[in-house]
A protein has these predicted regions:
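Bacterial carbohydrate/catabolite-sensing allosteric modules
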Residues: 1-3, 46-47, 69, 113-123, ...
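Alpha-helical recognition/docking segments in bacterial nutrient-uptake
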Residues: 1-3, 66, 74-199, 259
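N-terminal helix-turn-helix DNA-binding module of bacterial transcription factors
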Residues: 1-66, 70, 360-361
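Structural motif corresponding to alpha-helix initiation and N-cap regions
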Residues: 6, 52-53, 136-138, 160, ...
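Short acidic/polar active-site loop segments enriched in Thr and Asp
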Residues: 19, 65, 149, 207-209, ...
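Short, glycine/serine-rich, charged loops/turns that create anion-binding
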Residues: 27-30, 74, 134, 158, ...
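Positions that flank functional sites
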Residues: 28, 60, 131, 135, ...
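Short loop/edge segments at beta-strand edges and connector loops
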Residues: 54, 131-133, 155, 244, ...
Length: 361
């Protein structure tokens, strides 16, 4: 029986009932296609198992020498037409406006990418970093399958069912969350790290309730960190409450201001550093001294936490090491596709700084 012919863009167009040009627009510029049409095309791609990169299909059966890393991205800003005044305009931003947040500045991913690059290069591989807006990441993942020998995916970047599907077709490792299906995973001890810093806070905090600034409900890291927090405060006799943030500095400041309208906390434990930095800003605005009136901690170990006023006590994630181990785990999977799945958990450190008071207190 002859081998099954790989599906083509023509097959996708026929299945979806659209033109080839429309399929191309969905793959390259999904925001330019109506939602209903986009869903039909993506459904056809999924049903047929179509890999958009036609040239990459010719590489089947031999190595490319490239590893892929898929990370969350942002919608591209509008591009001014050539020769327009906006092309050379200098923008003035009120940097005292606390609502301004640079979405491109994400220290978490900077360290992770660096670790992946170091490990890939030292192992003789190039690293292809891919990203895209929410609507196109599943297509980007499909495209990566045809371009690389293996893929590293940040948890939540694409739905778990798509990760599980890709793991059946190409070696794949999930970072910052448990893997779906047969994929391997590399993550840190979120619950243990948060439990440790919470114990430290409970032993040193001024009087007042504990406010926990958690993360999004769909964040695996956020869920595990909240578990570690609850493990320590349950039964501690302390009064505590939880507020959810979007893991941004702005979100941390916003939730801190809302909480201050109702309570005067003796401690703020944040699920990430950026939320904690926002909380420091809101506390300062309210005239609440840190650490004398309220202690504050974060989680991640980003460089900005070292230079905040006061310097932020935090749980340091070894994100560079996570990147290194993700690549090494991927290479092991590439060498032995039938090996048992691996869930590697790396330890974290608590960095004690001024936001929790003198170290000897």
């Amino acid at each position: 029986m002859p081998p099954r012919k790989p599906p083509t863009v023509y097959d996708v167009a026929t299945r979806a009932g659209v033109s080839i040009a429309t399929v191309s627009r969905v793959l390259r510029s999904p925001q330019k296609v109506t939602e209903s049409t986009r869903e039909r095309v993506l459904a056809a791609i999924d049903e047929l198992g179509y890999v958009p990169n036609a040239s990459a299909r010719g590489l089947a059966g031999r190595r490319t020498g490239v590893l892929g890393l898929l990370i969350p991205g942002h919608d591209a800003p509008p591009i001014a037409p050539p020769g327009s005044a906006e092309e050379h305009a200098v923008e003035f931003i009120d940097d005292m406006d606390r609502s301004f947040v640079d979405p491109e500045r994400n220290h978490y991913f900077e360290q992770l990418v660096r670790g992946c690059e170091i490990s890939a290069w030292s192992s003789g591989y190039a690293l292809l970093v891919a990203s895209g807006p929410d609507l196109s990441r599943s297509v980007v993942l499909d495209d990566l399958e045809g371009r690389v020998d293996g893929i590293i995916v940040i948890s939540r970047t694409v739905p778990d069912d798509l990760i599980a599907r890709s793991a059946q077709r190409v070696p794949l490792v999930v970072v910052a969350g448990r893997a779906a299906g047969t994929a391997d995973s590399v993550r840190v001890d979120n619950a243990g790290g948060m439990a440790a810093v919470t114990r430290h806070v409970l032993a040193r905090k001024p009087s007042g309730p504990v406010l926990y600034l958690g993360g999004p409900a769909d964040s695996p890291d956020g869920v595990e960190r909240e578990e570690g927090f609850r493990r320590e405060v349950d039964g501690s006799g302390e009064s505590w409450r939880i507020a959810s943030t979007d893991f941004t500095t702005e979100g941390g400041a916003r939730e801190m201001r809302r909480a201050l309208a109702e309570i005067r906390p003796g401690a703020v434990i944040a699920a990430n550093d950026q939320s904690a930095l926002g909380a420091l800003t809101a506390l300062s605005e309210a005239g609440i001294g840190v650490p004398d009136d309220c202690v504050v901690t974060g989680f991640d170990g980003i460089e900005d936490a070292r230079w905040s006023q006061p310097a932020l006590t935090t749980v340091r994630q070894p994100m560079t090491d996570v990147g290194v181990q993700a690549v090494q785990t991927l290479l092991r999977r590439m060498a032995d596709a039938d090996a048992p799945g691996q869930d590697l958990q790396l330890p974290v450190d608590v960095l004690l700084r001024e936001s929790c008071g003198p170290l000897g207190r």
